[in-house]
Amino acid sequence: MDRPTSHRPPRAVVVGGGVGGLTAAVALHQADWHVTVLERAEALAPVGAGIGLAPNAQRALDVIGLGDPVRELAAWQGDGGLRDPAGRWLNRTGSAATAERFGGPLVLLHRATLVRILMSALPAGTVRTGAPAELTDTGDDRRAAVVTTPDGALGADLVVAADGIGSAVRRVLFPGHPGPRYSGFTTWRVVVPAPDRPFTPHETWGRGALWGTQPLEDGRVYAYAAALAPAGGRAPDDERTELLRRFGDWHDPVPGIVAAAEPAGVLRHDVHHMAEPLPAYHRGRVALLGDAAHAMQPTLGQGGNQAIEDAIVLAHHAGRGHDVVGRLPAYTEERLPRTMGIVRQATRTGRLAMLSGAAPVAARNALIRAVSRLGPGIVLRGFDGIADWQPPGRTYAAGAEPTTAPR
């Protein structure tokens, strides 16, 4: 492939049309790259459920001018916190305290809404659906990377591998790596109409199980659950019935949320995480991002957030397409330590949340109550160094500056 010139913009191929891949596509497009996104699915249908965007991801989106459209969808106002299955509060946390500490509130929205926002910033025809892709050449400083599709081969100055937890590109780059490990628990997610009675957003920790109920911007409710289970398990009847068995006697509004779900609308996925770091997040002209690079447990709500950060940092280091091979090591240097630190922190949080013995659970709950009495800031400290992250390069397209200094 010819080197990028004033007559030919650099070319990027993004493998995967999820949140991380689309964010990378927007960031590269705004840096004058010619971008093609290859998505295996036949359509970017409204699959998935809710996603929580913390202030760190919102600031990343500010770089591409999309932070404020996301903030406008904030539905969480007032208090929330952590409860036990009987409904007793273990700690209370307010949206105002979160915004004050980290420069913005947590924004819960449907993944399909975020995908629409990102797609609106891309030229028509950028995303090709029904387009499975195979990396056939990683490229180097003398030749292009090559991605092969059923319609032919595409040369690229940069390949962005955003192909998820089972990443085929990752296996090509690092065939000896063991990949993600089963975390010991499974998750369910569902979006339902709001219950008749108002509720306070919450996460509830039981014995080897948890439940969360959060409002969405469109008036619906996003609920998620997790429980210890063998890998690959499925309900003998349907997953809504399984949720009723496991959570039907928990505090309101949990039973009502489960009852309102359509059986076909309950999504179940086993949780895996990248226990062993990759040697790098790049090779040749190829860069990994999101779950393809650093799959993590959902216990900190940072999986999608870190993919968005990856995308912005990658575009920053890719620059205008000159010397991509020489620039990608800086992407690994910046992202690998941070993301693997969050992987480890999420794993520790998962261990705490999934305690199952009566005595350890009682001790855990007593400790959380004791710590929460010292004030909401104590609990929020667990997100210091995560939610207060600042993007590289130029700052915000939005007007609001964060109220805390970078850590």
Enumerate the predicted regions with their spans.
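Short phosphate-binding/catalytic loops that engage adenosine nucleotides
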Residues: 33, 66, 252
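Flavin-dependent oxidoreductases
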Residues: 184-214
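Conserved N-terminal helical subregion
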Residues: 2-12, 29, 54-174, 178-191, ...
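Short beta-strand micro-motifs enriched in acidic
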Residues: 136-139, 214-218
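FAD/FMN-dependent oxidoreductases across multiple families
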Residues: 196, 207, 217, 227-300, ...
